[in-house]
Design a protein with these regions (language model features):
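N-terminal secretory signal peptides that target proteins for export/translocation
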Residues: 1-3
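N-proximal helix/coil linker or "cap" segments that precede and/or mark the start of modular domains
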Residues: 6, 12-32
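Short, acidic, Ser/Thr-enriched surface-loop or helix-capping motifs
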Residues: 24, 37-38, 134-135
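A short beta-strand-turn-helix
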Residues: 32-53
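Short pre-active-site segment immediately N-terminal to redox-active cysteine/selenocysteine motifs
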Residues: 51-53, 57-61, 127
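Structural microenvironment flanking redox-active thiols in thiol-disulfide oxidoreductases
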Residues: 66-106, 116-121
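Thiol/disulfide oxidoreductase modules built on the thioredoxin-like
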Residues: 101-109, 114-159
Length: 167
């Protein structure tokens, strides 16, 4: 009986993992994200159609997250006029939100707290940083739950730049 219970647990776990990853696929319409930004303004990913949007899940205690932010900011400043936007969603606990807000003051990203915004269509965010890139038509072009989680200039130039130029 114990052997069957263990097998059932393994199968159910595998199915749940597949459901999380199957929830969002490259080349498909990206699920909407909507709610309130840290500044209180409303946000809806659907309202940003026509722009390339980088959605970055991060936390104030995450060193790789903080290291990639200046790179993303520099790219945003260079390409905002071409239709590039960044939404940074902090995964911090409520006690750390003040620290996250302090960090966000250095950047021109749209920023939100995970408790104030609905991103359920992206499945369980199990690692940070996790970065998703959505093209001007609302199609997912980078899935932050797979591959290398790091955002650097090379990735931005390879994925985002062609999307901005329409190629």
């Amino acid at each position: 009986m114990h052997r069957y219970r263990t097998l059932l647990f393994v199968l159910l776990t595998a199915c749940m993992c597949n459901a999380v990853f199957a929830a969002i696929e490259l080349g498909q319409v990206a699920p909407n994200i909507e709610g309130a930004l840290l500044d209180g303004k409303p946000f809806s990913l659907q309202a940003h159609k026509g722009k390339v949007v980088l959605v970055n899940f991060w936390a104030s205690w995450c060193e790789p997250c903080r290291e990639e932010m200046p790179i993303i900011e520099a790219y945003l400043k260079k390409n905002k006029s071409k239709g590039f936007e960044v939404l940074a969603i902090t995964m911090d606990k409520p006690l750390d939100i003040e620290q996250a807000q302090k960090i966000m003051q250095k950047y021109s990203f749209l920023s939100a707290d995970k408790k104030q915004i609905n991103y359920s269509g992206y499945g369980r965010i199990w690692r940070i940083p996790s970065t998703f890139i959505i093209d001007k038509q609302g199609i997912l072009r980078k899935n932050g739950l797979t591959g290398d989680p790091t955002v650097d200039t090379k990735l931005l130039e390879e994925i985002v730049t062609p999307l901005l130029s329409g190629h």
